[in-house]
A protein has these predicted regions:
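Short, acidic loop-beta-alpha module within alpha/beta folds
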Residues: 2-23
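C-terminal accessory helical subdomains adjacent to catalytic cores in phosphodiester-
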Residues: 17-34, 44-288
């Protein structure tokens, strides 16, 4: 089984299922979708609550992420039909997580400095992007949207938007980013960017072939823009990355912090789904 863990239960699965339908993503095993329904720092706190306090070098060592998620879902009354299909952790060969950067200013609710928040995200990346769970291609990978999942439609003109590499927002924009996207985006709705979902979380496929072709072409542009932007963040070259090693999630975070957060208190707009597509789906197609 391959487990997908999404921060939210609306935009993320909608995008993933649209891309899978249009580009025929072929996964080697059955997929399971789970919605965490909380932010990346809640994920950190949840995992830490199961860690061994005596192990200061690697507090996440020996954490069974699947059992942690099951217990979290039960304790917080979250739907977990997908997780219920997993009887034993060893049944899952790969896990992919998609979360927002979601940095917040220090206030009465958040006591963590921006440096402490970045440190926690870096710890999660280190844990998820190096942990193996038992099989040859197995592992866990965390992908981060900057600043949020809605970054997938942050463009000002009809695609492709050649100015995409320069788009940034204030690092503390938080939930206001959604309204900013609505005001900024050339498309005022998502009709030509993704399909809708029904009440059963199933994709409502369009019978309009022209619409399907437009969505598909738009995502080819979005993929290209985000791959070039990731490479620009990491290497200062707005071009296709020479390899996936150039634009690892850790490299992206480190360069976001150094070049944007620390210098300008900004974050460069970047969406995680094209990076997952490039890093995993394209490679999987080559292997099959």
């Amino acid at each position: 089984m391959i487990l997908f863990i999404f921060e939210g239960k609306d935009a993320e699965p909608r995008l993933y299922k649209t891309l899978k339908e249009l580009f025929h993503f072929e996964l080697p095993e059955e997929e399971i979708l789970h919605y965490f329904c909380n932010n990346i720092f809640s994920l950190y706190n949840t995992i830490m609550s199961y860690s061994d306090d005596e192990n200061k070098n690697n507090p996440f060592e020996d954490i069974d992420i699947i059992n942690v998620l099951k217990e979290d879902a039960f304790a917080n009354h979250k739907k977990c039909e997908g997780l219920d299909k997993i009887k034993h952790s060893y049944e899952v060969s790969e896990i992919f997580l998609f979360f927002d950067y979601d940095i917040k200013p220090v206030d009465s609710f958040n006591k963590l400095s921006i440096e402490q928040q970045n440190e926690r995200i870096s710890m999660l990346l280190s844990f998820f992007n190096s942990t193996e769970i038992g099989t040859e291609r197995a592992g866990i990978k965390l992908f981060i949207n900057y600043p949020m999942i809605e970054s997938y439609r942050y463009f000002k003109c009809p695609l492709p938007d050649e100015n995409y590499k320069d788009y940034t927002v204030n690092v503390f924009i938080d939930g206001a980013f959604k309204q900013k996207v609505d005001d900024f985006c050339d498309y005022k709705n998502t009709k030509f960017l993704c399909y809708d979902m029904n009440k059963s979380d199933e994709l409502k496929k369009s019978k309009d072939e022209d619409r399907a072709n437009i969505i598909k072409q738009n995502w080819i542009f979005i993929k290209e823009m985000n791959l070039k932007k990731a490479n620009f963040i990491c290497t200062d070259s707005y071009s296709f990355p020479e390899s996936k090693e150039k634009i690892t999630q850790q490299n992206i975070l480190d360069n976001q912090i150094e070049k944007y957060v620390n210098r300008r208190k900004e974050i460069a707009i970047l969406n995680a789904f094209p990076l997952f597509w490039f890093e995993y789906i394209d490679e999987t197609k080559l292997l099959t």
